[in-house]
Amino acid sequence: MKSKIIYLIIYIGITLAFSACSDNTDFPDEPDTYENIAIVYWMGDNSLSGAAVRDIKELVQGKDKIPTNSKIIIYADTASAFPVIYQLDAKNGLKVWKKYTKEEDCTDSITLLNNLKTIVKNFPAKNYGLTFGAHGTGWSWRQRRALGPDDNDRSADKWLNVPTLRGVLQELPHFKYIFFDVCFMQSIEVAYELRNVTDWVVGSPAEIPGPGAPYNLITDALCEGDAYGIVEGYDSYYPNNRYKGVVLSAVNCNELENFTATTSTYIKTFFADRHTVSSTVAQNIQKYSSEFSSFTYCYDMNSIMPYILSNEEYQQWVEAFDKAVPLRKASSGKWTTSGHCNNPYIYDSEHFGGISMYIPQEGADGNAKNNELKHYQWYKDAGWNETGW
C-alpha cells in the first residue's frame, strides 16, 4: 500500500506542475447539462506513470481549445500516488475534483463502472467521449487480457479484457467515440465487440510511440467527438526526432454489422473445414508484429482479403470496408516498435487497412487463441463458428 506521505508528495508535485490546479471545486455558473464531456481514463499504475503525468500536462496546454460548455474529466491512477479525478476547462484550468484516500484496482470492472458512473452522474452531458491510456495487448493474450495492467500490490498484474469492458460500457450512456491511446487495440474483434456502445473506435493496430497522442493538439477534437480530428491531430505529430511514426484508423461502428454480414460470406467459404492461408501467403500479408512474437494475430484485415477473394469479390468487399473504416493514417509509412515487430513498415501500402484481424492458426499457441476468439461476438457473427475453427 502506498503511504499518505508519498501521496502527499506526488500530489504537491502535480499541483506545482499544473499552475492552475487546486482542490477548490466551487465553480460559478455551472450548467445543468454540459454539451460535451470528454473522459480520459488513465490506467497508469505501472511503467506508464510518467506518461500519464505528461499527458495531463499536454491537456492543460491545450485547454484553450476546449469549447464553451465542455469539460475534460481525467481519472488518473499512477504507481506513485492514489487515484485522482481532475476536471479541466478553458475558463478554470485544471482542478482536482476528487482525491482518493486508498489504492484501488483501476482495471477491475466494478471499479471502472463505479468511477465512470460517478463522472457521468456529476457531469451530465449531451455527448460523452472516452479515452483510455494504458498498456495494451489487443483482443487476445493470456486469458484475454487487453488493457492495463494495475500492479498496485506488486504480486500480480491485473488487466481488463474487452468482453468485460463491453459489459461495463453497456451500463453507461452511449459514447461518441472510444479512443484507445494504447498499443494493438484497433482490431476488428475489439471494434465489433464495442459497436453498440460507441459511434466510433479510434486506435492503432500496432504499437504506438511512447509519448502516445499529442493531447495539446487534440483537446478540441476530444470534446467535440471528432474521430477524424483525433486521428489527424495524432498523425500530424509523428514522425519526430525520436519516434518513427504511428499507424491509426477510425472505425464507424454504425457500418460494422453490414460490413460483418458481407465479410462472413467469404470467411465461411474460404476458411471452411479449418482451411487457412498458406505460410507463404502469411509472409506477404501486412503484419503489425513479428511472426513468432506474442502478437502473431495482428494481420492487416484489408491486406488479407486479396489473397482469399477473387478480384470481383474483393471490389465488393472493399466497398463495405471503406465505409466501416473510412479513415486510415500512416503518413510516415512506419511505426515505432519496442521489439514486437522486426519489420515495422507499411509494405503493402496498396491494401493498407489500419485494422487487424486474426487468422486462426494450428499449434499450441494458435489453439489457445482460437479458443479465446470464441468469447467474442465477432466469432459467431463473422461466420467463424461455421468453419470448424
Model-derived segments and spans:
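Sec-dependent bacterial lipoprotein signal peptides
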Residues: 1-19
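Short, solvent-exposed loop/turn elements at domain surfaces
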Residues: 46-50, 82-83, 364-369
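Structural recognition of the beta-strand scaffold that forms the well-ordered cores
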Residues: 37-42, 71-76, 128-132, 176-180, ...
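Bacterial Sec-dependent N-terminal signal peptides
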Residues: 14-37, 359-361
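Terminal, contiguous helix-loop blocks that mediate binding/assembly
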Residues: 24, 31, 117, 122, ...
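Substrate-binding cleft of extracellular glycoside hydrolase catalytic domains
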Residues: 72-128, 132-134, 139-140, 144-157
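Short alpha-helical segments and helix-capping/turn motifs at coil-helix boundaries
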Residues: 43-45, 51-62, 109-118, 187-188, ...
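Acidic/polar, low-complexity intrinsically disordered N-terminal segments immediately downstream
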Residues: 25-77
